[in-house]
């Protein structure tokens, strides 16, 4: 959608709808355990009449799973395949031999001291508390750590068959989320020397589904929850025609020609939480009037919304943060696209929810300014990015980090929110969900320039740590405790391959459950030649007892 068409796309919002999100306080967990409780995907809930508990947060989710499909098992959490390298522009003078090595070295336990673990946290102010926690959890001074990841070495011998030097731009694709880039981003080398790279990011590589997900999708249609790609065929559909990569290599939309009105709510205060006095979750509720046919409202930081299209009323609410809580001191924003809202007022309440009547003393500063959507979203994005970094969702503050995050945030809003003219239910409350932008899976490409001498060769190698596909521990399925890894031979690549081979470094840690590579550990067959007419190879393994 062109940005100057946006104002014409403002549509009617449902007459009355309420969505609330609980403010859950969590104890900080070890980094290795942070996402190990993803088994919470086993839970689903309905909140109130006409309300749905949105499973938000953008954390990599899973499907309902299944016994399998042609070409390997269907796992509840599919990590995506290893893709082949490609060129920015096809070159008939360049051919390639590919060798991929799957190394199970991360499965070998290594000792990690409590001091080493605490020192690895990005915020120095947190380290003593983290060390105290680890000393409590591991009084022996540390623990043995291993991983279900593998090291993938994806090597390409590029041959220049022409009489002239060939300078080409190689593109290496991989699956990740923004929050997991530190773990998943490959290193690229040519003839053993590190290459300078540019990172490109694709859009959300998935879809949306109803509140009950795959368990009864035929009964519960909708677009409330994220629905991730479940197998390699999903990536084949995503990448085959090249449009997804073309978008990733292009520029992000500029929204500076869309006028908006921005309301900033800051310095919020209120009666402190006091369970005995019935003040269980001090909350500020903001109410205003609007014409639903002429106005679109985006919001950031609020954890509850109310719509009343019949009476032309909308509400937003947030829990008053206390010092020490995440987002403490951060402002809240309402961005108005179209006709301005009217009669903005607020009041404090003892808890959240739109039926609460008991009030408390509360206050805040409200400022209003006229701006454009590009500038307004940049301010919101800076706040969201800073919060995500402080909470440890980003391990490193990449030089390209914010601008990439900001571009993807705009892209996500223009594709799926009410700004698109055909938004999904997940975002119909107008909330800017920065955690979705950070957490959803997408395909990235690393770009590097290489020169291959005339009539000669160059070796380009991508090394990365690859997560497994798996079923959640609580699932009690046939694939429980099985880790899956897979690769595709040609998908998305314009290279002319003359040969592809694969090697396995099992480290004495695994037994093969299912595969189509042809490895035979017992008989020493750890290197195989691949059939390039076979589009997909898979390896499914189980850990063996080495005690």
Model-assigned labels for residue ranges:
Residues 10, 35-61:
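Single-pass transmembrane signal-anchor helices and their membrane-water interface zones
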Residues 4, 22, 40-41, 59, ...:
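Intrinsic-disorder/low-complexity regions
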Residues 27-37:
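N-terminal export and membrane-targeting signals
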